[in-house]
Amino acid sequence: MNYQVGTPGRIVVARFNDGDDILGGLEEIARRENLRAAAFHLVGAMKGGRYVVGPEREEIPPVPVWRQLAESHEAVGFGTIFWEGDRPKVHYHGAFGKRDQVKVGCLREASEAFLVLEAVITEIVGVTARRELDEASGMVLLTLENKESP
């Protein structure tokens, strides 16, 4: 385990309107505001998105199991933003509910708001976290320096 300690910085509140690209919008905010490290919460509704519900098997590199949101769902979740090279990279896990069904996963593509979706983004000041390609997994993962656990 590696870790760093930061402090809360600026807080950004955003509203996504019907049809807005959620992942793209979060990246745009991070780029415009130069948020190099942040955590965010989302609450509202979505009508589209491709998300991953885990690997097919517990092996490395993992083969993702993809699912699709194809209609409106209530949505709530948490995520982080750290940069990969010269661009912000969002990592978001959420729950998506409709009627008596709830789906949970990592939203990765084609994210589309329904009616309204709210975001509260908290900047993390004083950390040097970033995302880098992990050769073994083939995934872009969080990288931290210093403070290894005993």
Language-model region placement:
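N-terminal intrinsically disordered, cationic/polar leader segments
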Residues: 1-90, 95-150
